[in-house]
Each structure stands twice: as C-alpha cells, then as structure tokens.
Amino acid sequence: MLLGLHTYSFHLHGLGGDWGDHRWEGKRAMDIFQLMDEAPVLGLDGLHITAADCESTEKDQLKKIRTAAEKHGLYLEYNFSLDEKYDRRLTKTFEEGIAIAEALGADVAKVSLDLKRPRPLAASRHHPDVMRQLEDIARKLNVAAPMAKAAGVKLALENHTESFSSEVLWLIDRVNHPFVGACVDTVNAWLVTEDPMVAIENLAPRAFTNHFKDHRIEIESYGCRLTGVALGDGDIDLKRAYQIIREKSSMKRINIEVELDAGTDGPVEARRREREAVERSIRYCREVLHI
C-alpha cells in the first residue's frame, strides 16, 4: 500500500484550495514544487492535487509539475469539482478535468458532485431535487466516460460534503462504465447525517481512491462542533476503515487528508500546528496502521 497526501492538508500554507483562513494575505507559504521536494523526506509516495496547486493549468505548467513528480518518484492524482463555491479554480467540466489529469500523468481524477440539498438533511437522501441533479450528472458522465478511458484516467466520484453514499453508488450504477467509480472519504458522511463507517463499507468496493481523514466531535454549550484533527486523534474508527479498504477494495493507495482549523492563531502558529498534524498523521499510518 502506498501513502500519499491530499494537498488540502496544507491549506493553511496556501495549498489545496481556499476553504482555509481568508484573513491571511500575501504569498503562499508553500508551493507544489516545494511540497514535492519535501514529500520523500516526509515519507510520502504521492500527492492528490488540485488546480489551485498548479497555479496554471496551461500545458507547459502541467508538464513541469508532471516532470517534477516523476523526478521524485511520486504518483499524482487530480482533484476537481463540478461547482466549487469556495474556490472557483477547482471547478472544471468532466472534459477539462480529464485533460488536466492526463497532462499531469494522473491515473485518477476525483470529482466533487457539489449537489444542492434540501433540508432537513436526514430526510433528503434520494430526494427528487437531488435525483434531478444526479440525472444531469449521469448524462454528462455518459459522454465523458469514454474520454476518460481513452485518456487512461479513472473518474472517482466522492461522497463529498453533500452526498449520501447510496447516491454515489446510484450514479456509478446508472453510468455503468469501468472508468467511473468512487472516492471514499472517511469523514464526509457525517455532514449529511450518515454513519461514516456505513459509507466506507458501501463505497470501498467501488472506489478508485480515498480521502483518509479523521474528525473529532466536541460537545459545546450551543450543540457540537465537528473539527479536523491529526489521524488517530478523532472519532473515526480508522483501524476498521483501513481494514475495510484492504479487504474489500482494489485500492493500493491511502491519501491522508488533514483539515485543521486555524482557530484564533496567527499564520505562523497555525501553520506550525498544521505541519505537526500532517507529520503525526503520516506516523500514525506508518507506525499504527503499518502502511
């Protein structure tokens, strides 16, 4: 099993996308080439990257990134969204995403569906409003899937922050193409009130890739807070999650994702904590899970 890192794990350093802290202006603290230089030292085998990391998706820039990854012996996976509201750089059509992934030498392109859900969330699984969106995505996938096959790029549909695992499976079954599968995120099911362990069980057999992450539920006076932590510090049963992936999927890579909150810290301290969380997550995978 190879071990990689989703670049969003360094979002406070300026990588992955702008879901992070918008208060900090100026030059990013790390770019994709610096991370690739450091990846072998960190003990990583690959990176799961976005258009925000590439800075430009022009052919020359993508070739430069691909060459640097090959120099370091790193696999690359590409991550894009159909309608990313927080960072429009990540929004691509299926055709654009496939072309970028192919240029990078990535064999997997992860796709966020970005569904618009009615509330209450717990009552919205396969809601008619959601199904209309899924039908539209299925039509686009039917056109894109042969292109993905020709490019050698598998499309991995994620149970992102707005998708039930059964909806992802419905879409995969609807398209019924060997180059259309899942990306299983070990946390995201919580955000639509689904049991994360059930979602992992459901999606792992159909998954091409993963976001292997951990969150902790913190009870507070007004309710609760779900917050990203280093792997092993949260409430996801990661040992069981890894067992499911090993036993029930064909995946040969684990992609760590850390979603650390800057809190009230300034950029220097927040980035120090983020790096520490990434390093601890890598150690957890190596020393506890024996990846």
Please name every model-derived segment.
Residues 123-134, 227-229, 271:
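Glycine-rich tight-turn/loop motif centered on a GG-T
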Residues 12-18, 115-121, 217-224, 255-268:
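Flexible glycine/acidic-rich beta-alpha junction loops that bind and position SAM and/or redox cofactors
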Residues 3-8, 47-49, 76-80, 109-111, ...:
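Hydrophobic faces of well-ordered beta-strands that scaffold small-molecule active sites
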Residues 47, 139-235, 239, 247:
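Acidic/histidine-rich catalytic cores of soluble enzymes
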Residues 1-108, 132, 139, 177, ...:
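N-terminal pre-domain/capping segments
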